[in-house]
Amino acid sequence: MERIKELRDLMSQSRTREILTKTTVDHMAIIKKYTSGRQEKNPALRMKWMMAMKYPITADKRIMEMIPERNEQGQTLWSKTNDAGSDRVMVSPLAVTWWNRNGPTTSTIHYPKVYKTYFEKVERLKHGTFGPVHFRNQVKIRRRVDINPGHADLSAKEAQDVIMEVVFPNEVGARILTSESQLTITKEKKEELQDCKIAPLMVAYMLERELVRKTRFLPVAGGTSSVYIEVLHLTQGTCWEQMYTPGGEVRNDDVDQSLIIAARNIVRRATVSADPLASLLEMCHSTQIGGTRMVDILKQNPTEEQAVDICKAAMGLRISSSFSFGGFTFKRTSGSSVKREEEVLTGNLQTLKIRVHEGYEEFTMVGRRATAILRKATRRLIQLIVSGRDEQSIAEAIIVAMVFSQEDCMIKAVRGDLNFVNRANQRLNPMHQLLRHFQKGAEVLFQNWGIEPIDNVMGMIGILPDMTPSTEMSLRGVRVSKMGVDEYSSTERVVVSIDRFLRVRDQRGNVLLSPEEVSETQGTEKLTIIYSSSMMWEINGPESVLVNTYQWIIRNWEIVKIQWSQDPTMLYNKMEFEPFQSLVPRATRGQYSGFVRTLFQQMRDVLGTFDTAQIIKLLPFAAAPPEQSRMQFSSLTVNVRGSGMRILVRGNSPVFNYNKATKRLTVLGKDAGALTEDPDEGTAGVESAVLRGFLILGKENKRYGPALSINELSNLTKGEKANVLIGQGDVVLVMKRKRDSSILTDSQTATKRIRMAIN
């Protein structure tokens, strides 16, 4: 009763009655929604009714001096009434037209620079080609894709520092620009945007687009690089697709593509070396992709690919927690298991020791061309729902799932022995043995698996052992679906560990990745990849090995020279000479090495027979384990260009040609660099050229600072002392001579003193 009385009182007030009868929306929550806060709740509607008004725009009072009250047609451009609640003027949309036609003009030079990403997009679309539209069922799966073509790969924090430095250089706040890319971009943008009149906030927004990778989790069928994603709405619908070729490439896609190729090459090469992990790190640190250090790209680039993730794990970076098997990315979506070693017998009665996963688990499997949902129990496949582009892709997914299930009928389907090896000639682990076996031929596996009658379920059909579709029967537990399975959406990264054989494990010890998972697909990189590591010289064939070996000796001649006289064994064991050995005929390797080492020893013993060009030429041959024999050679053979070519022990040849006049070396006609000293002047021992004018005082003395390289010695003043690095990491203390007259005697004492200082 009380409430009704209260309501009557309220209704007697005319304002209450008006609100409740004339407001169509009388639900308090809705009124609240549309009236609270500054955020516009229905921008489209607001725009429509605003534009229906005569003066929908407000402007600063100064506009009255800058724009006439009426235009040429006599239409009013602004009203004398003030905007309610502010001291601004109400303005007609016609004023904007007048301003665009008659207002002041400013320089447009900065627009293409600030709105670079938009201008480039227009160019790509202008030069792109749109093909025919096809109507067909689209198997789209959600993938994490890059939606922002043409960006650098800075982290949000790095980009923020760059933007603050470029747009608001005088703002307070510590900004630390550390990475190479940050410094380069900042310098470039500051120059480009000098005297820029565009609103700083706008410039900041546009810079963010250029610097940071933006990703979204979108349904995609087809290309996933950013130049395809920017036209996703034009190229694929629910039941149609339109062919499209982009009218240009962008650096970020090229970086992703080239990074994958470099990582695959490096992992493949590291696998066959004595210490795969150390080799992999050495190669990652000495490789450049498109002029940027590979390690910098790895730190910033979120690409998830097996080889890339192995490189990241080696560098101690976090990677995705999903694991890889048979080229598919597996993500456990529910269940759990414990692992137990079990011995099983193949159809050929070979014993395999496999790690069995005990327990019920569900996984999503995502590959490039097929996806699946897998439910399994201990050594039993319960259900596999697979979808793919074609029969072949679906078959690949089924094989991987069947092997992963570890079912007995799969193991019994093995015919013949399992003895697959990796690139380093090591036996693969049992699961990969099985996988390789059935990837070669899966007929027996499919025949032995068993089939079952199926119910008619919308969007699902059966698949027979010969991989043909059926609506009545299907391989036991296997169904083909029209719908794809989404990629795992989380961007969560976990801490992992890596062993020296490049097996990557999570903190529970599960293997996430191993070199067996790295694709053998070869591609051509879009950006130039420079592998400075000697391990990658052979990637471009024997000629490249030859040229690179000699270039390396010349580049490091100052140090090589000292080692040659002080510690030849250490020099011969350098890994830079490893690739060269594959060019020397196996039968003569040891003999050549023994011959060259003896020759070098004679040069060391007899002053005055030191010949730089000859040492450089023969040095790589001395790296093989030597055979003691009295054999003498006038020429040494190397296998390049498909046949044996000769290097003359004394004198020039097409393989190795040293021009005394120009002091330049050509190897197989390619320039291999210049010798910095004349080969004839090294008569008085090797160090003479290096430490002439310096007195060797003894062992390293930390008081005189960090060790300088030989090239840095020239900066010392007379009488100044410094530690200097010679040979393989040996450091001695030297002093620059006060007088020039005594220089000649230095060369004789240098060798003795270095030996004493080191020993």
From Swiss-Prot:
Does the record bear Transmembrane in its keywords?
Answer: no
Keyword list (alphabetical) reads:
Cap snatching, Eukaryotic host gene expression shutoff by virus, Eukaryotic host transcription shutoff by virus, Host gene expression shutoff by virus, Host nucleus, Host-virus interaction, Inhibition of host RNA polymerase II by virus, mRNA capping, mRNA processing, Viral transcription, Virion
Q: Where is this site: Avian adaptation?
A: E627
Q: Where in the cell is it found?
A: Virion; Host nucleus
**In Gene Ontology terms, what is one molecular function of this protein?**
RNA-directed RNA polymerase activity
| A single Gene Ontology CC term | virion component
Identify the InterPro entries for this entry: Flu_PB2_2nd (IPR049110), Flu_PB2_6th (IPR049114), Flu_PB2_C (IPR049115), Flu_PB2_CAP-bd (IPR048298), Flu_PB2_middle (IPR049111), Flu_PB2_N (IPR049106), INV_PB2 (IPR001591), PB2_helical (IPR049113)
Q: What is its main location?
A: virion
Q: Where is this motif: Nuclear localization signal?
A: 736-739
Tell me the GO BP annotations in alphabetical order: 7-methylguanosine mRNA capping; cap snatching; DNA-templated transcription; symbiont-mediated suppression of host gene expression; symbiont-mediated suppression of host mRNA transcription via inhibition of RNA polymerase II activity; viral RNA genome replication
What does the sequence similarity comment in the record state about its family? Belongs to the influenza viruses PB2 family.
Q: How does it assemble?
A: Influenza RNA polymerase is composed of three subunits: PB1, PB2 and PA. Interacts (via N-terminus) with PB1 (via C-terminus). Interacts with nucleoprotein NP (via N-terminus).
The role this protein plays is: Plays an essential role in transcription initiation and cap-stealing mechanism, in which cellular capped pre-mRNAs are used to generate primers for viral transcription. Recognizes and binds the 7-methylguanosine-containing cap of the target pre-RNA which is subsequently cleaved after 10-13 nucleotides by the viral protein PA. Plays a role in the initiation of the viral genome replication and modulates the activity of the ribonucleoprotein (RNP) complex.
Q: What is this protein called?
A: Polymerase basic protein 2
Q: Which organism is it from?
A: Influenza A virus (strain A/Equine/London/1416/1973 H7N7)
